[in-house]
Curated annotation (Swiss-Prot):
One of its GO terms (biological process) is Arp2/3 complex-mediated actin nucleation. It comes from Schizosaccharomyces pombe (strain 972 / ATCC 24843). This is Actin-related protein 2/3 complex subunit 4. PANTHER family: ACTIN-RELATED PROTEIN 2_3 COMPLEX SUBUNIT 4, ARP2/3 COMPLEX 20 KD SUBUNIT. Disulfide bonds: none annotated. The lineage of its organism: Eukaryota, Fungi, Dikarya, Ascomycota, Taphrinomycotina. Component of the Arp2/3 complex composed of arp2, act2, arc1/p41-ARC, arc2/p34-ARC, arc3/p21-ARC, arc4/p20-ARC and arc5/p16-ARC. It holds the Pfam family ARPC4.
């Protein structure tokens, strides 16, 4: 793990932990229903200011909080076209299996690669620090996986080019 990744992940961890102070909040419109206010957005007084934790211009997190839910969006570093393709395909693969991840959204927030939605029910059923650990570990693993796939792809391209050029 790089030296700049650790402080970034620590900042994300502390901010996300503070944002997960969620409680039950019934809908003001429909009786006996509770909807994630960060998704619905009908009551602006219930929404908190969105926070952006940034490592650099290409890599950042958006944390949108409300009384009963938190939407956590990640923009993954994409320096070149290969990384853009790898990230897009990898995120499509994960979002296609969103029902396996209880907190993963099928569609990310505009401008971000992947989003999570954590409601007060998730924090009641699961431990808050385990949710935060999962997201931080997810960020570490995705960063490592994309780097590994890019190295493998470059090595494979080099091998194919050498094989092709050896014919001449």
């Amino acid at each position: 793990m790089s030296n700049t990744l650790r402080p970034y992940l620590n900042a994300v961890r502390s901010t996300l932990t503070a944002s997960l102070a969620l409680e039950e909040f019934s809908s003001e419109i429909v009786e006996r229903q509770s909807q994630p206010e960060v998704e619905v957005g009908r009551s602006p007084e219930i929404l908190l200011k969105p926070l952006v934790v940034s490592r650099n211009e290409q890599e950042q997190c958006l944390i949108e909080s409300s009384v009963n839910s938190v939407r956590f969006s990640i923009r993954i570093k994409q320096v070149d076209e290969i990384e853009r393709i790898l990230v897009r395909k990898f995120m499509q693969f994960l979002m296609g299996r969103a029902e396996s991840f209880f907190i993963l959204r099928r569609k990310p927030v505009q401008g971000y690669d992947i989003s999570f939605l954590i409601t007060n029910y998730h924090t009641e059923e699961m431990l808050k620090h385990k949710l935060v650990d999962f997201i931080i570990e997810f960020m570490e693993e995705v960063d490592a996986e994309i780097s590994e796939m890019k190295l493998f792809l470059n090595g494979r391209a080099r091998l194919v080019a050498e094989t092709y050029l050896s014919c001449f």
